[in-house]
Amino acid sequence: MLPVVALVGRPNVGKSTLFNRLTRTRDALVADFPGLTRDRKYGQANYDGYQFIVIDTGGIHGDEEGIDEEMAKQSLLAVDEADVVLFMVDARDGVTVGDQAIADHLRKQNKKVYLVCNKIDGIDAHSAMADFYSLSLGELYGIAAAHGRGVEQLLEICFKPIAEEYPDVIVPKDVASEELEHDEIDYDKLPLKLAIVGRPNVGKSTLINRILGEERVVVYDMPGTTRDSVYIPMQRNEREYVLIDTAGVRRRGRIGEAIEKFSVVKTLQAIEDANVVLIVVDARETISDQDLNLIGFALNAGRSIVIAVNKWDGLQNDHKEEIKRELDRRLGFVDFARLHFISALHGTGVGHLFESVEEAYASATQRISTSKLTKIMEMAQEEHQPPLVSGRRVKLKYAHAGGYNPPRIIIHGNQVKDLPGAYQRYLINYFRKSLGVMGTPIKVEFREPVNPYEGKKNQLTLSQQRKRRRLMKFLKKKK
């Protein structure tokens, strides 16, 4: 489970600036969920190799009588989802009525709250911050989010309690990858964690109940560490699975479509915890921007994906063809993912989903030798040579595996970091086709040889120093 950090405060205190600074990594999800989360923005961020979800709650107003209860329930829902709350105030404005109202609300919550004074650049920070001790929220932390001043120190302090609470969950990525490269992991013997995600009322509940009903095995609900998600162990064809159900707890017989509460945090955490993500979309509504956001997050997280288009039964043939054309147009960036047309209610096509799930997992965890990867790279070069960069041909020397789940291929060569994006995509697609990889993203990294003398000054030998002194004396005499 990824820990959650919520940014709370009045409008224009710098929450969005800090949000953008924290989510500057390539893995960041910079997408809004309009209509589902109000003003809240959710992003994936990275600090010192640690992954976490950050929420920008949007501006919260207050008055002399405090925050309106109903508005607080809506605007401060992120506080309930958070492990850590960063309460941001504007050091230049001093304490306002809105700050006091928000502080009163936060003191009632059983959450770790850090009071962050933003915009301390160019002013006497100590005197400006002193006023905020009246909010009675403990120590103050001064930052300038626009310039990054104090942000790293703040994160270091924030992550101490999180690391203590989740020592087995939050592991720096470089450590995890080293363990993955050196330990022989038998993925076939591990339970396959399958997250079923999607927008509200696309049929997730019905699909999960259909899967569990078809298996006719004794299952039980095992509450996971992810908020409100349910981890359901099951077995299919002698294969162990764990279904990660983000739709909440329900009785098996209750398969009617109720209005589901959509929790973005719950969904993103389920994606991070899964091996394969089954994304359910509604055929009658076609693909939406929110569906694309979920797919994009799964890809950025390196998860294998399978897409299920639900409620396919009962549609006219011409309508089905129209939907297929729309899916082809909007899902071109994930053409490697298997697409299934199903009816969770009637069971049509549900059994075939697991064939694609197992295929995607096998593709993500297959071991590939250095010789095979290098051979494929050489074949790709023979068909299409790398382009010229500054008049010189880019040289690709060899390739090797850098990790699994998802597959990570590292290519060594000269000037490889200058390869244009089009050629990088060509290599990824060539590797995918040659390896027969389906359902999982492939990550390719490029590395150049390190020059050990780069940035170092040459030391003169004794004879060179004497020669230099003689030359300097000669030049002085000429003047």
UniProtKB/Swiss-Prot annotation:
Q: SMART domains this protein is in?
A: AAA
A Pfam entry, by short name = KH_dom-like
| Domain spans labelled KH-like | 366-450
Q: Where is the EngA-type G domain?
A: 3-166, 192-365
Q: Which HAMAP family match?
A: GTPase_Der (MF_00195)
Keyword set for this entry? GTP-binding, Nucleotide-binding, Repeat, Ribosome biogenesis
Residues recorded as binding GTP 2, renumbered to this chain, are 198-205, 245-249, 310-313
Q: Please list the GO terms describing molecular function.
A: ATP hydrolysis activity; GTP binding; ribosome binding
Name of the protein described by the UniProt record: GTPase Der
GO terms for biological process, alphabetical:
ribosome biogenesis
Which InterPro entries does this one have?
Answer: AAA+_ATPase (IPR003593), G_ENGA (IPR031166), GTP-bd (IPR006073), GTPase_Der (IPR016484), KH_dom-like (IPR032859), KH_dom-like_a/b (IPR015946), P-loop_NTPase (IPR027417), Small_GTP-bd (IPR005225)
Reported function: GTPase that plays an essential role in the late steps of ribosome biogenesis.
Which Gene3D superfamilies does this chain map to? 3.30.300.20, P-loop containing nucleotide triphosphate hydrolases
- PANTHER family from the UniProt entry: GTPASE DER
Subunit annotation? Associates with the 50S ribosomal subunit.
Q: Quick one: which residues bind GTP 1?
A: 9-16, 56-60, 118-121
- The keyword Glycosyltransferase belongs to this UniProt entry's keyword annotation: no
Q: Which domain of life is it from?
A: Bacteria
Similarity comment? Belongs to the TRAFAC class TrmE-Era-EngA-EngB-Septin-like GTPase superfamily. EngA (Der) GTPase family.
